[in-house]
């Protein structure tokens, strides 16, 4: 390869991938609720019903606080013992239940960052696992921006790439949601 020349994959794949990502974001924008943006406000709230209820972080923090020490595992092979604190996702779902679809609970939960650039999906029953947390603290201190402040997900049954940081939207759905890393070839379930 000559100096200044890009590898064939970078030359041909990056623009196509960028176009696919932009198209995917447009598609999601048409079918996913956009929180307070629709009302001309910030998208820093959560929306557990599709469409519907807007929640602030304070609405979530009234739920019981729970602490958990688990091993955080990265798919790259490293791991770390972490002390987490936050709200059980099961408590959140019980307090702000999904609207029924055809008389039954939706099957999936979709989450994305406030800017919509990162998004992931989960089975609803996995989100109800007693150790799945909406985290507000890590290692005895409030979450930092680097670790996903003000709210991130922790699932000790999943690899780290499924543990979304900076949650800006939560929606329930009966359709298996898009997932950022799955589109790049990673497993949708990411189970340990």
What are these regions (language model features)?
Residues 2-192:
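Structured, non-membrane catalytic/scaffold regions adjacent to prosthetic-group chemistry
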């Amino acid at each position: 390869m000559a100096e200044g020349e890009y590898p064939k994959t970078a030359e041909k794949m990056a623009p196509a991938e960028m176009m696919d990502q932009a198209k995917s974001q447009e598609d999601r924008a048409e079918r996913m609720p956009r929180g307070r943006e629709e009302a001309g406000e910030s998208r820093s709230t959560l929306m557990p019903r599709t469409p519907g209820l807007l929640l602030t972080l304070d609405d979530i923090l009234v739920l019981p606080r729970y602490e958990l020490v688990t091993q955080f595992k990265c798919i790259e092979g490293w791991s770390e013992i972490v002390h987490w604190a936050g709200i059980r996702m099961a408590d959140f779902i019980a307090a702000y239940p999904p609207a029924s679809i055809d008389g039954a609970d939706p099957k999936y939960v979709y989450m994305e960052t406030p800017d919509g650039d990162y998004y992931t999906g989960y089975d609803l029953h996995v989100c109800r696992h007693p150790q799945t947390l909406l985290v507000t603290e890590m290692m005895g201190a409030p979450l930092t921006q680097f670790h996903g402040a003000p709210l991130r997900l922790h699932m000790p049954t999943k690899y780290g790439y499924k543990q979304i940081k900076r949650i800006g939207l939560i929606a329930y759905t009966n359709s298996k949601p898009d997932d950022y890393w799955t589109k790049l070839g990673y497993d949708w379930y990411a189970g340990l």
